[in-house]
C-alpha cells in the first residue's frame, strides 16, 4: 500500500485559499441559487481548484443541507428582514464548510492516499436504501445515470475530506488523529538532547574503611541513632555494638 502523509496546518494556510469578499455573498448567492442569476460566480479557490455557486457545486450542497436543517428546526424567523439576516449566516457557514471540505479533499489527493472502489461502493449503497435501511435494486435502477455519477463523486470527495480531518483530529470519541499540542513537538525534541550524564563505581561494604564508617556515624547521631549488625542476636546487643562502633 502506498504511504501517505498530510502536512500539518494545511487548512490554516493563508496562501492555499483565495477567498473573495464575504459581502458579495449577500448580493450574488441568493438570486443565483433561486434561479434569478445568470452564470456561475467564482467564490474562491484552494490550490487552484475553484469554488463556485453552481447548482451541483460543493458550496451549493453545503448551503442546501444547512438551509434544510435550519428549516427543519424552525430557525428561520417569520420576519422577512430577520429571515434575510439568518440566511446570510447560513450562506457564510456554508461557504466556510465548503472551503474546509475542499481543502481536506485536495490535501488527501496530494498525500498519495488511494480510496478503494470497494469502500466507495459500500458507502454509496446508503443512497439507494429503503426507509428501513436496506438496499433497493428498484431505487438504483430508477435513478438516472447522471445522478448516480454525481452521487458517487460527492461520496468520494466526502470520504477523502473525512480522511484528512480524521488524520488530524481523530474520531468524535477522541481516538486517533494527531492532535498535537503546540509545545509537544518542542518537548519531545528537548527530551532527545543530552542534558546530563552519570559515571559511578560500586564498592562493596567490606571495602569501605572502618574509620570512615565511624566518622560518618558520629557526624549524624540523630539520623543514625542505631546501627544494626546481622551477627547481634538482640536489639540491646545491636545498640551496644553500634555505640561501640561510634
Swiss-Prot record:
What sections of the protein cross the membrane?
Answer: 7-29
The species this protein was found in: Treponema pallidum (strain Nichols)
User: At the top level of its lineage, which domain of life is listed?
Assistant: Bacteria
The alphabetized UniProt keywords are: Membrane, Transmembrane, Transmembrane helix
GO-annotated cellular components:
membrane
Q: What is this protein called?
A: Uncharacterized protein TP_0928
Q: Where in or outside the cell?
A: Membrane
Q: How does it sit in the membrane?
A: Single-pass membrane protein
The main location class comes to membrane
Amino acid at each position: 500500500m502506498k504511504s501517505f502523509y498530510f502536512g500539518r496546518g494545511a487548512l490554516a494556510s493563508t496562501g492555499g485559499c483565495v477567498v473573495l469578499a464575504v459581502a458579495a455573498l449577500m448580493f450574488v448567492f441568493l438570486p443565483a441559487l433561486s434561479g434569478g442569476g445568470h452564470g456561475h460566480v467564482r467564490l474562491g479557490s484552494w490550490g487552484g481548484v475553484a469554488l463556485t455557486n453552481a447548482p451541483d457545486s460543493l458550496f451549493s450542497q453545503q448551503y442546501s443541507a444547512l438551509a434544510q436543517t435550519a428549516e427543519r428546526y424552525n430557525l428561520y424567523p417569520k420576519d422577512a428582514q430577520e429571515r434575510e439576516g439568518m440566511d446570510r449566516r447560513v450562506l457564510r457557514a456554508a461557504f466556510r464548510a465548503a472551503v474546509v471540505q475542499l481543502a481536506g479533499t485536495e490535501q488527501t489527493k496530494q498525500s498519495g492516499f488511494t480510496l478503494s472502489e470497494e469502500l466507495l461502493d459500500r458507502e454509496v449503497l446508503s443512497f439507494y436504501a429503503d426507509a428501513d435501511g436496506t438496499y433497493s435494486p428498484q431505487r438504483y435502477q430508477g435513478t438516472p445515470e447522471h445522478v448516480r455519477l454525481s452521487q458517487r463523486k460527492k461520496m468520494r470527495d466526502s470520504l477523502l475530506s473525512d480522511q484528512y480531518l480524521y488524520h488530524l483530529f481523530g474520531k468524535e470519541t477522541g481516538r486517533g488523529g494527531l492532535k498535537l499540542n503546540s509545545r509537544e513537538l518542542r518537548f519531545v525534541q528537548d527530551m532527545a538532547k543530552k542534558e546530563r550524564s552519570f559515571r559511578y563505581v560500586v564498592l562493596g561494604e567490606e571495602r569501605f574503611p572502618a574509620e570512615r564508617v565511624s566518622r560518618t556515624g558520629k557526624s549524624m547521631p540523630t539520623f543514625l541513632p542505631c546501627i544494626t549488625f546481622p551477627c547481634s542476636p538482640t536489639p540491646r546487643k545491636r545498640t551496644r555494638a553500634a555505640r561501640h562502633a561510634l
